[in-house]
């Protein structure tokens, strides 16, 4: 494995390979933080709107925007607590939303699968 690339595996749980190490994200993140990271990572580095995330996770909340902001803050903090990831910014704030784009080359297994499947159609 090339340590300058980050591999994200979503098909079998949620693991991240980086720097010669494999991290089972279920060991580091709460269920909600894990779900939020999954949704962001599935968007292939595209902006995910706040409205979409609030409707998906906090539809019945009295203050969904506050809940979203708190959970993004918490997710960023939890990721920084993993020693190998302390210098990587995973989640960028964009106008109207958030974008998952680590500052290293990232390969998500679901994106590879979609590309391979499209090639055989």
Predicted regions, residues:
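A short linear beta-strand->loop->alpha-helix hinge motif most characteristic
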Residues: 84-121
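Short N-terminal amphipathic alpha-helices
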Residues: 47-52, 63-69, 86-91
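Short amphipathic alpha-helical recognition elements used for nucleic-acid or partner binding
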Residues: 25-56, 75
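DNA-recognition element of transcription regulators
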Residues: 29-38, 61-83
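Short boundary/linker motifs that mark transitions into or out of structured domains
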Residues: 1-34, 91-97
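Short hydrophobic/aromatic patches on the structural cores and recognition surfaces of FHA
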Residues: 16, 53, 75, 97-98, ...
């Amino acid at each position: 494995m090339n340590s300058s690339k980050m591999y994200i595996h979503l098909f079998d749980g949620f693991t991240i390979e980086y720097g010669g190490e494999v991290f089972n994200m279920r060991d580091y993140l709460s269920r909600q933080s894990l779900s939020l990271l999954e949704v962001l990572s599935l968007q292939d580095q595209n902006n995910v709107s706040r409205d979409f995330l609030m409707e998906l996770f906090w539809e019945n909340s009295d203050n969904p925007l506050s809940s979203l902001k708190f959970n993004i803050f918490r997710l960023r903090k939890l990721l920084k607590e993993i020693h190998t990831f302390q210098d990587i910014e995973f989640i960028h704030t964009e106008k109207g939303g958030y974008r998952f784009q680590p500052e290293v080359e990232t390969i998500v297994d679901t994106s590879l699968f979609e590309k391979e499947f499209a090639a055989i159609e």
